[in-house]
From Swiss-Prot:
Enzyme class per UniProt: ligase
The protein's Enzyme Commission number: 6.3.2.8
Pathway(s) annotated for this protein in UniProt: Cell wall biogenesis; peptidoglycan biosynthesis
Family of the protein in this entry: Belongs to the MurCDEF family.
GO molecular-function terms, A-Z: ATP binding; UDP-N-acetylmuramate-L-alanine ligase activity
Entry protein name: UDP-N-acetylmuramate--L-alanine ligase
Organism per entry: Rickettsia africae (strain ESF-5)
Amino acid sequence: MLLLELKKTNQTLETIHFIGIGGVGMSGIAEILYNLGYKVQGSDLVENYNTKRLESYGIKIFLGHAEQNITNVSYVVISSAINPKNPEIKEALERKIPIIRRADMLAELMRLKCSVAVSGSHGKTTTTSLVACLFEAAGLCPTVINGGIINNKSTNAYLGSSNYLIAEADESDATFIHIPSTIAIITNIDPEHLDYYRDFETLIGAFRSFITNLPFYGFAVCCIDHKIVRKLVDDITERKIVTYGIDSEDAHIIAFNINTDIASSTFDVKISLPNVLGTTIIEKITIPTPGRHNILNSLAAIAVGIELDFGIKAIKNGFNNFKGVKRRFTKVAEYNNASIIDDYAHHPEEIKATLATAKNIANKQNGKVIAIFQPHRYSRMQYLFDDFMFCFADADILYITDIYAAGENPIEGITGRNLVDKITKRKHHDKANFLAELDDAVGVIIDNAASGDMIIMMGAGNISSFANELEGRLSSRGFSCHTVV
């Protein structure tokens, strides 16, 4: 960033172009650079919430990728999701315009800051938001670059005035190990992104490097309720590690006396850190979001706050302003007194956590859980097919659509229908159904929804757009639906 800063100060402002600027990771970095005073523009195939937000700031957005989009740019930023045959990449190579990976640009933003990097197979986005909440409660004003829209900010990234930067660290292509973080959080490690890593051990090795690459004065925060994370922590001696959990009695930070309701969770925390607070109990911490997994996410934030000496008051009250993250158990509508939830869960472990939360709420309301799941990527389904057969136990009624390709080519035998057939044949669920078209979900809701039910629409594809359009879809059939967000 020093070279960019020099150019921004002493020369004509040069333009940074983002290919795929509407992506949640790319849009956040673009917004931060824009707020720092750089000239930013970008392109994407379709308009979305992120492109509209950036355009409202005055950032030039091109719809579609074309050589002429980069006529007057000095740098091009890409993510690993961009095809090397993209015409803008080819043009940049032809004109010898520097091409910068998204992770490298993030690293430059973090280099001169005290940075907190949040990684793990699941829970990164919510944990990043919760960490930011505690920093703000402590009177600090961090820069935040998140992997999801923070509801009370209406953005996934915002510029702060302090020397702290909190970022979600994407592990999908191993670039996260090069991020110059001071504090590293690992929420969990599950088999994911095996199309890149090829095997689970290589993925675990990347998380090991994520910790060991920390400076000697930094520290890691790890959830040892997760057995793979526990083993990793046990094997690392060269860096300071603060542990947390619910079931792990030897963790430095433990949640207990847990009470949950439809919209929140309350718990006590036991802290056992001799060099910080000694053994201390903080009572009645409340997070305004349900779910055991979210309690674990909050413990990661609490661990950071304790190590940085935020104080008991900030830690106890720090989550009061947390309003959640879009697509993380987001209630989007009500139909026939049933709640319709939009959730990003697309991995078996995420699905289990989401449905467990829904089941707990439905039981208290004498309702049932209706799960509508859109699988995401053929490669993920292929690698985790057996795990997908076992992850829907908390759904009373299950519907699975075909796979959202996300740019991948089909794989023979890997389909949503095949998954339903295997689940049914092996009797893992007695009410599993295949939805040939996502639009058929409207009929599912009309036929099944009753008072107290939780209708969970899950996936990383276009099922979210569908969930947010339900009011119009139901109205077109003569049914009334109340939109919540």
